[in-house]
Amino acid sequence: MMIHPQYDPVALALGPIEIHWYGLMYLLAFATAYGLAWYRSSKRDNWTTDMVSDLVFYGALGVILGGRIGYVLFYQFGELVQNPAYLLKVWEGGMSFHGGFIGVMLGMWFFARKYKKTAFQVFDFIVPCVPTGLLFGRIGNYINGELWGRVSDGGYNWLTYFPQAAAFDMEQLQSNPQLQELIIEVNGQYVLPRHPSQLYEAFAEGLLLFIFLWWYSSKPRPRMAASAVFLLGYGISRFIIEFFRQPDVDQGFILLGWMTKGQLLSAPMIIAGLIMLIYAYKRGIYDWGKQAAY
């Protein structure tokens, strides 16, 4: 088993300027998305590098605004009601994938209107580039020691002791005394072994989904299909990994005694993705390749 290193949140300090790991991960995510989108544009007659620059700008804006607003609405709504200014306290952290996803969709919709494309022409073009952002984001979560997984006694070598979870571990120990045999002391704090669910998500929602989507979209597919595969891939991955991820402290299990907020938000993505995929192939409209209607 491993002990989380408790990395310094500052990745690089240049005099008074401090670059935090999480900010660096966002920078890498946007830079990688731009590079991949630029490459894809070189393979498409109806996309230019200027359009890619605009697209990434709209996407970045959607991620940041949507991610923050979504986090506050989905996970901290009570705090927002009591203190509306909490929405602006971005320095305290808090981003939601599902909120960022909605923000990106809105950004892509505005982009599509500007360049007279359909929304799904834009979505299908950019979705293969999105999982790399999820990959870097989850690595950032791991470095920060946040969004850790559930306690496990499985004895797996990769289980991790997160000192950041010490206070929560003590609460779990009080309600489950049988966990006593698993506890160890780290820097004066008593912690339990947990699944490094951030890395599970980085691997499944990030690396694996990127590889599959990149391959899938490298050949002509009907309009809407790539977007549908993304929804299915992310939704299924997130739904499964939520069984290993510790539910948010202030949320817990919100449905049926086992379903988390992440699963509740991912289920509609799975359903929508399946419906869209069936519809896309049934309709059979192609935007490039021999079957495209120019």
Curated annotation (Swiss-Prot):
Q: Which GO BP terms sit in this record?
A: lipoprotein biosynthetic process
Question: What's the short name of a Pfam family annotated to this entry?
Answer: LGT
Q: Is-annotated flag, keyword Membrane? A: yes
Q: Which GO terms describe its cellular component?
A: plasma membrane
Where does the UniProt entry say this protein principally localizes?
Answer: membrane
Q: What is its EC number?
A: 2.5.1.145
Which PROSITE patterns does this chain map to? LGT
Q: Which GO terms describe its molecular function?
A: phosphatidylglycerol-prolipoprotein diacylglyceryl transferase activity
Q: Which UniProt keywords apply?
A: Cell inner membrane, Cell membrane, Membrane, Transferase, Transmembrane, Transmembrane helix
Membrane spanning segments where? 10-30, 55-75, 91-111, 119-139, 196-216, 224-244, 258-278
Compartments, as annotated in UniProt: Cell inner membrane
The enzyme's main class, written as a single word, is transferase
Biological role: Catalyzes the transfer of the diacylglyceryl group from phosphatidylglycerol to the sulfhydryl group of the N-terminal cysteine of a prolipoprotein, the first step in the formation of mature lipoproteins.
Name of the protein in question = Phosphatidylglycerol--prolipoprotein diacylglyceryl transferase
Species of the source? Psychrobacter arcticus (strain DSM 17307 / VKM B-2377 / 273-4)
Q: What is the lineage of its organism?
A: Bacteria, Pseudomonadati, Pseudomonadota, Gammaproteobacteria, Moraxellales
Q: Which gene encodes it?
A: lgt
